[in-house]
A protein has these predicted regions:
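Solvent-exposed loop and edge beta-strand segments that line ligand/cofactor-binding
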Residues: 12-16, 52-69, 109-125, 167-180, ...
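Extended ligand-binding groove/face enriched in aromatic
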Residues: 54, 69, 78-194
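Well-ordered alpha-helical scaffold segments within catalytic/enzyme domains
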Residues: 12-15, 29, 69-85, 126-142, ...
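Long, repeat-rich segments with strong aromatic
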Residues: 192-328, 334
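HEAT/HEAT-like alpha-solenoid repeats
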Residues: 25-32, 36, 57-61, 96, ...
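Low-complexity, Ser/Thr/Pro/Gly-enriched N-terminal "stalk/linker" regions
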Residues: 13-60
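Hydrophobic alpha-helical targeting segments used for export or membrane insertion
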Residues: 2-12
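Surface-exposed peri-terminal alpha-helical interaction modules
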Residues: 84, 100-103, 135-140, 155-158, ...
Length: 349
């Protein structure tokens, strides 16, 4: 049985070690690969013109900062899940190389630098919190040390979100990094896991304000040609985290009244995987799959929509995972993280 068949026939959240090794290999190949590199870098003086590893010495690989962060999360997630696997030792060595107190102090200094108040907000900050949560939950002495070293940067991420959200007058409803719904889900999971009641309360209030009265989300108009997140499904996946099942079912009926239309839930096809923006649609198939699984989990057991949602999730899962090959770095530097988030059912735990 090939690796894709192993994933597609496994129960939700169950992962074969061979599949995990495949995804770990992608992250190991990029977390310390400095080039090519796409910087989101504000320069305030000539002294700010430095190579990526000098600017952000923990998270300089995997093409961009946020992909490096979730590449490290992938390694932590899979090494935690498969501590005896051959790849686990390599994953821990990579984490140990990156997550030093010195490197992370430099990351704090960079993020707090002049002109960087919006750096990686909200997407990269949310993934940083997801990395922190993985390390916090991992019962391992090395993970505890890395989590401790990460705490100052974690605190900066929380502070940035808490300062920004009260001023954000509208949600950001796009299919790429700036989207608020997806980032809220990651940040909310961290706040609950870390016991940060203040951030949890703020995210809950903002989500209710932004989304609770939404109706008739135009799912049929999705996706944009370079989306990797569904605005409609991400919003629903967030709200199922906040509402009891009966209330979520009622909210979903008005938010997505045509949710039984399979035409709006067909996987997308990438026409050129060597194009970094067009390749986003492979990630969309993966994120749609886990969002559909989340929505299904948020509905009562007897809800008639569950069967259709499960079918749609499976078709998107198959289409998305088939693309996680590493053939092109444009997708190889990040799709493994999305695949890992999906197959380990991280959003449901």
């Amino acid at each position: 049985m090939n690796w894709l068949a192993l994933v597609l026939t496994a129960h939700l959240g169950q992962v074969d070690e061979a599949v995990a090794a495949r995804f770990a290999k992608l992250a190991l190949a990029c977390v310390h690969r400095e080039y090519p590199n796409k910087l989101a870098h504000v320069l305030s003086s000539p002294a700010d013109a430095k190579v990526p590893s000098k600017l952000t010495p923990a998270f300089y690989g995997c093409y961009d900062w946020h992909s490096s962060v979730h590449g490290h999360w992938l390694l932590a997630r899979l090494a935690r899940t498969f501590p005896g696997a051959p790849f686990a030792a390599d994953a821990k060595r990579a984490l140990d190389k990156s997550l030093t107190a010195k490197n992370l102090a430099a990351e704090v200094a960079y993020v707090e630098g002049k002109g960087r108040v919006s750096f990686e907000r909200p997407y990269g900050l949310a993934w940083l919190l997801q990395l922190s949560l993985e390390l916090r939950e991992w019962d391992d002495p090395d993970a505890k040390r890395w989590a401790k070293a990460l705490e100052p940067l974690e605190a900066v991420a929380v502070k940035r979100l808490m300062e920004w959200l009260p001023k954000l007058s509208r949600p950001i409803r796009v299919g790429e990094h700036d989207q608020t719904a997806f980032a809220f889900g990651l940040a909310l999971d961290w706040a609950r896991g870390a016991g940060h009641r203040e951030l949890e309360a703020l995210l809950t209030e903002r989500a209710q304000t932004y989304y609770s009265n939404d109706v008739s989300c135009p799912l049929a108009y999705e996706p944009g040609g370079q989306d990797f997140l569904s605005p409609c499904l991400a919003e629903a996946d967030l709200m199922r985290r906040l509402l009891p099942k009966p209330r979520f079912a009622a909210w979903l009926s008005t938010f997505l009244p045509g949710f039984g239309d399979s035409k709006s839930l067909e996987p997308e096809r990438v026409t050129d995987r060597s194009d970094p923006k067009l390749a986003h649609l492979d990630g969309l198939n993966l994120s749609r799959a886990w969002m559909l699984e989340g929505i299904r989990a948020g509905l009562p057991d007897d809800d008639a929509r569950r069967a259709m949602i499960e079918t749609a999730a499976q078709t998107h899962r198959a289409a998305g995972l088939e693309a996680v090959t590493g053939e092109h770095y444009e997708g190889g530097h990040w799709l493994g993280s999305f695949a890992t988030y999906l197959v380990t059912a991280r959003g449901l735990r």
